[in-house]
């Protein structure tokens, strides 16, 4: 899960649906990005950075406990 992305979205006062609408993507696609299951393209991350005011490098971080992360990471 991208905890920083979720926190930034909530701090911006946006639901997942409202964020998806702002990004002009489906709710499911946004949910997969926030869950760390999809990466999204650079335009999405640029827009997320603009909306939240948080650098996209921080937003992209996936929690170490995410099941897709290896033990070495």
Where is each model-derived feature located?
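Conserved hydrophobic/aromatic packing and binding residues within compact polymer-binding modules
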Residues: 5, 19-20, 30-33, 59
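Short basic helix-loop element that most often maps to the first helix and adjoining turn
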Residues: 3-22
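A subset of signal/propeptide-processing and intrinsically disordered low-complexity segments
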Residues: 24-25, 29, 36, 44
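Short, charged recognition helix plus adjacent turn
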Residues: 11, 32, 39-43, 50, ...
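Short alpha-helical elements of helix-turn-helix
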Residues: 3, 42-45
